[in-house]
Structures are given as structure tokens and as C-alpha cells.
Amino acid sequence: MFDKYETYNFFYDSRLAEYMIPTWPYDPILLIRKLSNGESALIKPAKGSLGSGVIKLNKIGNEYFAYLQTVYPDAVFSTTRELFFYINKVMVKNPYYIIQPFINFMKDEDSVFDMRFLVQKNGDGVWQITADLCRMSFDDFYVTNLAYEIIPVQDVLKQLDLDETIMTQMKDISIEAAMIIEEKAGPFGELCVDFGIEENGRLWIIEINGKPDKSLFKEISHEKTSSIAPYNTI
């Protein structure tokens, strides 16, 4: 599984840099600076945790607000000491964290969604998109790990009347991402690329997973999966 900060560094000098969410190693001083500047921040384990340990943070007036999975505050603090005591309790099981800006992603009604593309090598070693899906969050959740519905990406694009060229763009980016990571990290056979669309229409890569959970992809045919070459998976 890819380290999120390492993955970010794979792309910072590539054409895909504009799609990568800015990422920093966890630093309490940096976090407070961003919150004091009126930014909302997301802190999360550097390696995937299925949404566990992810905290959204912001500062309103003199108070700090912490959110776990939903848009409703889990806790409110009046001092940084209280805030960091709370954060440290969450981080105890996974001390290596990162900081990212919190991005307001587009919703379908009250459901945030992300779009996942499975990229695999065929028998000739050529990267191809073999499946896609869209995870719809429960209402008022800001994470999609506990999705209430999984639908094809094309369906959500139609529901929101989004330009269908976005589909082609995400496929092209996914294949290019696989090629870049292989160049940086060595041969492997498959990965997933997760995308989100910001409310202003900007496309972002949320995450790249080198050990995809293929059970989510109900639309992958037996013919496609049986043709995948036996490459190493990171």
C-alpha cells in the first residue's frame, strides 16, 4: 500500500501535479498556522485505514472544532493543549500522519461521492482501465469509506449533468498515474485511483491505492480479470 506522502512526492514534478492534493507530514505548528489562517484541515494516517483515524479540523473564533466522519463536531476545544490531547489519543494506533487541506467536494443532494478507477496490466503488459465505480456517502458524512451506495461513475456524471469528457480525463490520468508510479517504484500489476470533484468543478486525485479491494467492482468481467498478467502488486 502506498504511503500518501511518498505518493504525493512521486507526482510533484509531473504533469499530474495539478491534480494532487497538497500533502505535508504531520506537524503541530503547521497545523495551528493553517487553522489560524482560517483554513480547514484534514489529518489522516499516511497509510490507508478505511477512514479510521481521519479528523477534519477548523477554527471558528477562538475555538477549535474536530469532526470524525460527519459534518457534525465530535469535540470543541478552547485551547491548543486540549486539541492536541484529543489528536494524540486518535493518533496513538498510527503515529505517522499527514496534513491536507479539507476540500469541499461536490455532492449528489447531501451525499459526497468519490470515483474509483481500477487500472490493471493486460497479458501484454499494457495498462488499461478494467472497471470503475462511484461511492456515495451517507447523508452528512464527509468520507465515503462507509458508502451507502455504489454505482457506475457514468451514472453520477449523468445525474449531475457533468460533462462526459471528465470520464475520459479521469481514465487518462489513471493510466498515466500507473506509468509514473511504475517508473518511480518499480514493476507492479494493478492499482486504484480515487477522484473527487471540488464544488468549483476542479478535479482532484484523492488517493492512489496499490492494493485495491477488487470485491467492490461488481462490473469487472471474468474475461478481463483472467487476462491480467502476474505482475507484483505494491
Enumerate the language-model features and the residues they cover.
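Conserved ATP-binding module of the ATP-grasp superfamily
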Residues: 16-25, 42, 61-110
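Beta-strand scaffold of nucleotide-dependent catalytic cores
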Residues: 55, 67, 111-135, 205-208
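Short beta-strand micro-motifs enriched in acidic
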Residues: 60, 118-122, 196-200
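Glycine-rich phosphate/pyrophosphate-binding beta-alpha loops
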Residues: 51, 135-141, 209-218
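Charge-rich, low-complexity intrinsically disordered segments
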Residues: 214-234
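Conserved N-proximal alpha/beta basic substrate-recognition cap immediately N-terminal to
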Residues: 1-40, 45-59, 64-65
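A short beta-strand motif that forms the metal-chelation/ATP-contact edge
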Residues: 195-211
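A long amphipathic alpha-helix within ATP-dependent nucleotide-binding catalytic cores
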Residues: 88-106, 122, 127-131, 136-196, ...
